[in-house]
UniProtKB/Swiss-Prot annotation:
It is found in: Endoplasmic reticulum membrane; Microsome membrane. Heme binds at residue 449. Its main location: endoplasmic reticulum. It is a single-pass membrane protein. The chain crosses the membrane at residues 2-23. Pfam families: p450. The gene is IFS2. This is 2-hydroxyisoflavanone synthase. It comes from Glycine max. It catalyses: (2S)-liquiritigenin + reduced [NADPH--hemoprotein reductase] + O2 = (2R,3S)-2,4',7-trihydroxyisoflavanone + oxidized [NADPH--hemoprotein reductase] + H2O + H(+); (2S)-naringenin + reduced [NADPH--hemoprotein reductase] + O2 = 2-hydroxy-2,3-dihydrogenistein + oxidized [NADPH--hemoprotein reductase] + H2O + H(+). It is an enzyme of class 1 (oxidoreductase). One of its GO terms (biological process) is isoflavonoid biosynthetic process. Involved in isoflavonoid biosynthesis. Converts liquiritigenin to 2-hydroxyisoflavanone which spontaneously dehydrates to daidzein.
């Protein structure tokens, strides 16, 4: 009995000794309430039952109408705070980002399939700062990106040839599928120097990144690797790892031969993986780059640059089909600047302001990540409420993009709003770099997407090329080509990492005069 009492007192003493001492800041926040929350909160699942019948951004809009622009939920056992105004976005992502909101939330799938090395997801710290600097200074700097421009041009020409062949045969093309092939091949060529083998595995990775499991939100289950979800992660990892191992081995040999002065025929030089392998061999680097770091970065580039750009481009094409006056105005600009005798080049987009405005308007209405996520790393006060440490923070970017308080006629696809200045509700020169909090398709602050320029430039180039070369004929339910006012496509959404269209965009391309023969030749 005395022994049990002594052990109990020892455990209590250890608990009191190891428990974090409350800081002056945490003591000051004790009297503050949590943001308002719906009732009831159910055992085990929290408020997840309130989200089951709608896409997340729609469910959060409904809840914000009842509980205000800042409210709290429980996703299982995880406290969650939802913000839905630009003013709140700025408080979280600018005013308090450095101290409390500089880390992203990651699911079990993201953590394991990025080898716990994702620069997009790892906690803020020395590794993140080092790799982020490496990406910006060595992988996405102007010199490297410009050097790889022929690769990007090659992939766009390949896409246009598929369109030209479809036009010549007058057969329907699944543009949803072709756009994914384009973005996947482009990223794969720039990252690895090859395009084919990794494509299908990358799609599986992206699909599971857009899904959640109860184990991600219920604390007792968090570290259990059980169930179908975890088995899928294992299966994907078992397929992906041997492929990327083979590519790394191949590129390492190419880098070695080039260092020895050999000419390696038929292989692309200067791809991102070559640079990473050179850094991995550099013993003077402040952080040693391991093979797992490289694998994680490969997944990062695929997840950031494949699905999001393809889905955004598809949304843009759907909007252009449904808004023929916008399409005609865009075509007039392309013909005026580029003409009909040569194909659009990436550098032309700097002289195509209306095309760039179409890209911005697409991201306003269809942001790649409709709900941006962060994690609270230190307790904080926002608008008189306490935000608890460890809370998941959700920013409903989709809601702000459709809010009439911040946008004039927000349900209309009107690129002109990004070219007009001075009028109330107009955007004028707003950019996509995260400093205008009513427009955050790529996030903001330290954790915003580093590839925003590459993504928007590629999207603008492909859109301008398609507008220059083809009309898209929409099919009806019986496979017939629709004409006039009937030539519309559905704008219904479905769940996914980037919330794509619910239905594939299937069209019959119609080549404009003289273009098909140039592409096919």
């Amino acid at each position: 009995m005395l022994l049990e009492l002594a052990l109990g007192l020892l455990v209590l003493a250890l608990f009191l000794h190891l428990r974090p001492t409350p800081t002056a800041k945490s003591k000051a926040l004790r009297h503050l309430p949590n943001p308002p929350s719906p009732k009831p909160r159910l055992p085990f699942i929290g408020h997840l039952h309130l989200l089951k019948d709608k896409l997340l951004h729609y469910a959060l809009i409904d809840l914000s109408k009842k509980h205000g622009p800042l409210f709290s939920l429980y996703f299982g056992s995880m406290p969650t705070v939802v913000a839905s105004t630009p003013e709140l976005f700025k408080l979280f992502l600018q005013t308090h980002e450095a101290t409390s909101f500089n880390t992203r939330f990651q699911t079990s799938a993201i953590r394991r399939l990025t080898y716990d090395s994702s620069v997009a997801m790892v906690p803020f710290g020395p590794y993140w700062k080092f790799v982020r600097k490496l990406i910006m200074n060595d992988l996405l700097n102007a010199t490297t990106v410009n050097k790889l421009r022929p690769l990007r041009t090659q992939q766009i020409r390949k896409f246009l040839r598929v369109m030209a062949q479809g036009a010549e045969a007058q057969k329907p093309l699944d543009l949803t599928e072709e756009l994914l092939k384009w973005t996947n091949s482009t990223i794969s060529m720039m990252m690895l120097g090859e395009a084919e083998e990794i494509r299908d595995i990358a799609r599986e990775v992206l699909k599971i990144f857009g899904e959640y499991s109860l184990t991600d939100f219920i604390w007792p289950l968090k570290h259990l690797k059980v169930g179908k979800y975890e088995k899928r992660i294992d299966d994907i990892l078992n397929k992906f790892d041997p492929v990327v191992e083979r590519v790394i081995k191949k590129r390492r040999e190419i880098v070695r031969r080039r260092k020895n002065g050999e000419v390696v025929e038929g292989e692309v030089s200067g791809v991102f993986l070559d640079t990473l392998l050179e850094f991995a061999e550099d013993e003077t680097m402040e952080i040693k780059i391991t093979k797992d770091h490289i694998k994680g970065l490969v997944v990062d580039f695929f997840s950031a640059g494949t699905d999001s750009t393809a889905v955004a481009t598809e949304w843009a094409l759907a909007e252009l089909i449904n808004n023929p006056k916008v399409l005609e105005k865009a075509r007039e600009e392309v013909y005026s600047v580029v003409g009909k005798d040569r194909l659009v080049d990436e550098v032309d987009t700097q002289n195509l302001p209306y095309i760039r405005a179409i890209v911005k308007e697409t991201f306003r209405m269809h942001p790649p990540l409709p709900v941006v996520k962060r994690k609270c790393t230190e307790e904080c006060e926002i608008n008189g409420y306490v935000i608890p440490e460890g809370a998941l923070i959700l920013f409903n970017v989709w809601q702000v993009g459709r809010d009439p308080k911040y946008w004039d006629r927000p349900s209309e696809f009107r690129p002109e709003r990004f070219l007009e200045t001075g009028a109330e509700g107009e955007a004028g020169p707003l950019d996509l770099r995260g400093q205008h909090f009513q427009l955050l398709p790529f996030g903001s602050g330290r954790r915003m997407c580093p590839g925003v320029n590459l993504a928007t430039s590629g999207m603008a180039t492909l859109l301008a090329s398609l507008i220059q070369c083809f009309d898209l004929q929409v099919l009806g339910p019986q496979g017939q080509i629709l004409k006039g006012g009937d030539a519309k496509v559905s704008m219904e959404e479905r769940a996914g990492l980037t919330v794509p269209r619910a239905h594939s965009l299937v069209c019959v391309p119609l080549a404009r005069i003289g273009v098909a023969s140039k592409l096919l030749s």
